[in-house]
Amino acid sequence: MTILEKEDRVEALLAQLTLEEKVSLMAGANFWETVAIPRLGIPSIKVSDGPNGARGAGSPFGSSVTAACFPVGVALASSWDRDLIEQVGAALGQEAKTKGAQMLLAPTVNIHRSPLNGRNFECYSEDPYLSAQMAVGYIKGVQSEKVGATVKHFICNDSEFQRNSISSELTERTLREIYLPPFEAAVKLAKTWGVMSSYNKINGVHADENAELLQGILKNEYGFDGILMSDWTGTNSTVNAANNGLDLEMPGPTRWRGEALVKAVETAEVKLEAIDEAARRMLRIIERSGAFEQPHTEPEQAIDRPEHRALIRKAASDGMVLLKNTNNILPLEKDKLKSIALIGPNVKTAQIMGGGSAQVSAHYVITPFESLKTVVGEAVQLGYEIGCTNHKILPKLEARAVNGNTFKLEYFNNHELSDETIHSENLKSGELLLFGEIAPGVNPAEFSARLSASFTPDSSGTHQFSLVSVGKSRFLVDGQMIADNWTKQIKGESYFGFGSTEVIGSIKLEAGKIYNLSLEYNNSDVPLFAAFRLGYLPPIASDAIERAATLAAHSDVTLVFVGTNGDWESEGHDRTSLKLPDEQAALIERVAAANPNTVVVLQTGSPVVMPWLERVAGVIQAYFPGQECGNSISDILFGTTNPSGKLTQTYPLRLEDNPAFINYPGDNGRVYYGEGIFVGYRYYEKKQVTPLFPFGFGLSYSSFEYKNLQLGTNLLESGQSLKVSLDVTNTSPRAGQEVVQLYVHDIQASVSRPNKELKAFTKIHLEPGETKTVTLRLDPRDLAYWDDLQHAWVAEAGEFEVLVGSSSQDIRSRASFVLAKTSALG
């Protein structure tokens, strides 16, 4: 069927719809599906959370229908590899189809305005051009599988502080130059099927009601022809949202549409044209997805593909950033080592993802300890000490820690855990989050559940257990109440702000003895979804740091695995500090003092301060790398993969140095983007503030030389593109990859402009001694700024400098040209 024939079918169906049916298409039927209209053969479409895995409708924790867990957004973007990102997108499209979904709720392209943002891990960068390029690759990959991407969150959802109500206050120039480009590219270059509006307001108007942004810019100016959906419960009105361009309210059943919207049309408060346009867009997406021919009817599947495992491992290692490598301590060589000390809270924990809606129940995970044990075999002695913890709430009790490697979960159709069991299943985790979908036969309006397992502790002493829940919960050991979150719950940050604070209880247990664990739960007073989480912490020695230092002192090399996790970095709340949690900094200092051959493997989604940096020999930023966590880290440590990742965000020396510091998080319902266009490295360069690590920085086990920079012309006419070429040589004996970065500086600007703006990059592979000629291109828009008076892009006549290098501060070659004439661009 041709595009014209498909549009004809859309129009033919639209003409047959009643007003009530059109309106029904404008809201979800349930948490994940739109409304079907059987009389006309119009199926529902199903959406699934991304962006680092297609979860489906099940719980992101321990669900039997697992999913491939890919690296988080910042890790993918740190590869600076468009082709790789597109491959990841295609794999996620394949994963979405295993869950019966026609649309993936991804990618997340909000800008890293502040290093404290709880969702920075999920987004790509502080730079709009890099974010746009990564988004385009991701979307093209997803949609190559006939699954629609949904770029989010439109717009300026750049922190989690009061995200449902706060107003982001900014100028048009700031909006155009920094925050809109990823969405513009997603629409114009990648033809995204979907856009999701944000919760916040922009200059006083909620995103879902903002006619200037939704209609004026997104649909009319950019030409977006897909569906614009709300974030979940992010619709704020009946009339304004419908009139101003919000096509789909999610989730269902509707709160704002239905009969209320029909009445608003009948009373002329909402234009019929707006209803027709929204329904048309919904039908168009159903058509594009092929759902008319193949509606989703199959149950969700977990298909663990070997090629996806390999891709996840490559994407993870290619995105890791080598920050320090004194005396080439890395890569490690097995035949030169007798012992390695593995120290830190992340050695035996796979920190694969951040928190919030991006979470998935992974097919499998591998920890650094498990992977390194396989890599070194019997040749190298591995010692382990935890040293300290890094949790915000007690670590989740996983099924592999209990007898039989599984939890039993039983459901009851009442709040008292009485009468017959309605449904039972096994879980891989002590956590359950029910986003709309629930087990067969269970009444979602009123149910209770019991999670049980037998447990044999490895050590004697005081063991801690904890509960966090949306609803009532209590935890018992051999029938004894240990943690009571049933009698009273206090609201906390967990589960997007709907969950309770953590309730912790302790009990003395004996090593080797079998205990019966039971978590009881009911969903009374639950607003949107049900959830519980069982945390556990075994006894930790009071001298744990000293024990770690002793182990380090008697080892050839020490690897310290530290960072944050999905409790610290999550949707729903921001961080409050750039410090590593708990005593991790003290642990690194003490271990490095005991053994100077110390390498820190850092796992965070955002910058942290590093007061210990000068005392360690090496640092790797491994991020949250997905299910191949341990393997991808091992690949970097032992040189199976030559590190080629580059930072996508500036790491400040201290929190106070970041440009958003003065205006973060906002007050009186507003946050002023006072730094304007000077976000990230633009600010550090302009104000000459020295960062800990600059944007675009990343070391390699190889070395590269830049030479012969040439411009296509020294006098550029208006409307012309500029060709930029140079030679890059691998001057080392090891094959490697280099990211060549091109920045532009408008030397003679009449307005304040950054000293450097990233406008082009490419990633190349070079064999030892090999030279490649790199060709990059600057288009007229790359030279322009947004003029608030003309409401247009303006490229001013005068001298421009082209700067090419390995990072924003490691500039290897420079050249200049003159733009002959000032012009306003369309």
Feature locations, PLM:
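Glycoside hydrolase catalytic-domain context in secreted enzymes
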Residues: 1-785, 792-809, 825
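Short beta-strand elements
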Residues: 810-825
